[in-house]
């Protein structure tokens, strides 16, 4: 098992099907002294009509990592809205990227994207990112 930052485990869910046993997953990870870190929760479409699910993840012990590209609208308006909700409600613990190709990098460094990052993440956090 490869962990991040001591005992953090980066976790992902299916994009097509909501998890049936998220509580059990969290429990199993936590009792083994690992910290679950949910990657890009804003991108799971089944949560777009139920933002309470993000709070529930936090209650279950998950840390949340928002994808920077999500803030820009790269993955669509619903994903951007969810990402902004998570950040605006102080539910995000980390921001990251899902950088798979050059186009992702181009969007991340675009002037409009930088303005969005500054707006939603604040100057201090953005400067640490740069």
Give, region by region, the residue ranges found by the protein language model.
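Short acidic/histidine-rich active-site segments
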Residues: 91-107
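Extended, charge-rich low-complexity interaction segments
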Residues: 10-11, 72-76
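Active-site neighborhood of phospho(di)ester-bond hydrolases with catalytic His/Asp-centered motifs
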Residues: 37-39, 65-68, 93-97
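Mid-to-C-terminal alpha-helical segments outside catalytic/metal-binding sites
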Residues: 109-130
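Extended substrate/RNA-proximal surfaces in nucleic-acid metabolism proteins
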Residues: 1-63
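Active-site environment of divalent metal-dependent phosphoester hydrolases
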Residues: 43-47, 71-74, 100-105
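His/Asp/Glu-enriched short active-site or ligand-binding loop at hydrolase and phosphoryl-transfer sites
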Residues: 61-73
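Charged helix-capping and loop-helix junction motifs
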Residues: 23-26, 49-56, 77-87, 112-113
């Amino acid at each position: 098992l490869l962990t991040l930052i001591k005992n953090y485990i980066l976790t992902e869910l299916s994009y097509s099907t909501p998890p049936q046993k998220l509580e059990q997953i969290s429990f199993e990870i936590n009792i083994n002294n690992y910290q679950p870190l949910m990657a890009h929760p804003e991108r799971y479409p089944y949560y777009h009509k139920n933002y309470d699910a993000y709070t529930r993840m936090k209650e279950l012990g998950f840390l949340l990592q928002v994808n920077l590209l999500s803030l820009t609208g790269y993955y669509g308006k619903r994903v951007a809205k969810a990402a902004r909700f998570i950040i605006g409600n102080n539910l995000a613990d980390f921001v990251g990227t899902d950088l798979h190709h050059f186009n992702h990098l181009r969007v991340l460094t675009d002037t409009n994207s930088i303005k969005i990052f500054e707006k939603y993440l604040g100057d201090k956090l953005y400067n640490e990112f740069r």
